[in-house]
Each structure stands twice: as structure tokens, then as C-alpha cells.
Amino acid sequence: VHTTASDGKYQPREVVRLAAGKGITSLAITDHDTLSGLQEAQAECSKYGLKFIPGIELSTSYAEKEIHLLGYNIDRTSRSLNAALTELQNARRHRIEKMVKKLADSGIPITMQTVQSKSAGSSIGRPHIALVLKELGIVKTIDEGIKNYLSPGCPAYVPRYRLSPFEAIDLIKEANGIPVLAHPGISTPLELIPNLINYGLQGIEVYHPKHTADQIVFYLHFIADTAKSLLITGGSDFHGYEKTDYANFGAMKVPLRSLRILKSYRPG
């Protein structure tokens, strides 16, 4: 689940209230490359009796593919993780500034100030630009804005500094967390996964709104055949901007074994 700390629509406390209203009993906040929403979310979860799982979603790159690593039950005071996040946030902002300039130079009435106003947190990203494009009537959805204007091959695209997935695993483990490969069906090369497992990956997000039924079956079989010890996880990837977000919120499956481990995990 994402909040205004990165590219979500709702503040951490609002996301918790939405979750409670849906009868959700456990909630993981995994904002992109930031920890800034965790304290507020944890306090609100305590009020509503929800089990809170502090997390993060780290943006990484491998063979020109964007790979995301989820970290669950992380220690948000980790020095190494916070130092890396500061570097990532600075690089992220410089990239967004360049993208906004390209769009403005093409004649689109967009400014960095307007984009910044869409982010209430420390993390600013492409969805904030896409939201402005949507409000200007240039695109109909956030996904369309990212796909048609802000992705590789598009006029306003700017590559960004990223960690490697192996560096992300190290950072998550140094923060006493559980590293999980996020939505591999979107862009993760299959040949990379065994290398990540050998390096210390502990789970795969099998259930995700953008995974097809065939992909879900494939990853379930992959885990059963090659790495039975891997956690099978799932997430709504809730951002709050599209109608489908609300249908998916709380609807993704998480095996009971995995949920118990995520809830109770303590580093050995």
C-alpha cells in the first residue's frame, strides 16, 4: 500500500482508516524509496487495532529493466538504509525536474511547483507528473500518462539513478527486514530470479492486480519446483487514484503461513 509519503493519494492515517473500514486486519505500508509515512501509519493502526507491518518498496535496475524489491518488517532507524534513501531522493527529484522541463519545452503548461504540490511526502515521482497531465486533460488515467509520456522511448523520459536489486537486498537485510521481489510479472527477467534467491531473496509477490491468472500459476509452480522455502506474498499496490484500486484493496491473497511470518518475523 502506498501513501502521500510517496505516490499515493491518501495520507498514512487515511489509508489505515480505509483499511479498517474494509475489515482488513493486517496492513503493510511500502512507499517508494521512503520511510517517512511509517510512524504515522503505525500510530493509526494502534488506534484501530490493525497489525502494522513497516515496509518499503525500493526501486532498482537490472539489464535496463525496472525491478522493485519490497522490504517487510524493516527497522526504520537503519543508518545504511536511510543514507541510501537520501541519495535516492535527491536523484529522484533531479530526474523529475528534467522531465517537467522536457514537457514544458514541448508546449505543455506544467511547472515543477505544480507537480510538487501533488506530493505531500518526501518522495516525488512520475505518477505526480502523470496526475498533472490528467488534470490538464491530456491523458485520462495516471497509467496512460506514464506509458505515453514518461516511459522509455517517450519524449519526456529521463533515466534515473537506481540501486541494483542485489544492493536493495543488502539494505533490506541490514535493516533486519524480509526482502521480497515485487510484481515480477511486470518486468523482471526470469533468469534473474534464481540469482536473487541465491543472494538472499526470501519471497516473491505472486498475487498482484497486474498479474494474469497464468502468471500467478506460473510463479506458484516456480516456487514449488525451485525454492519451496520462499514466502508467497500478495499486495493490492493501492495508490488510490483509480477505481480499480478500491476493488483490489484487501482482495489480494496472502497465504496464512506467509502472513504469520511477516507479522512475527524477528531477525536471527
Where are these regions (language model features)?
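An N-terminally biased module of ancient metal coordination in phosphate/nucleic-acid-related enzymes
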Residues: V1-K65, Y149-P155, E167-N176, V180-A182, ...
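Acidic, metal/ion-coordinating pockets
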Residues: G268
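Extended substrate/RNA-proximal surfaces in nucleic-acid metabolism proteins
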Residues: E44-P194, K253-Y265
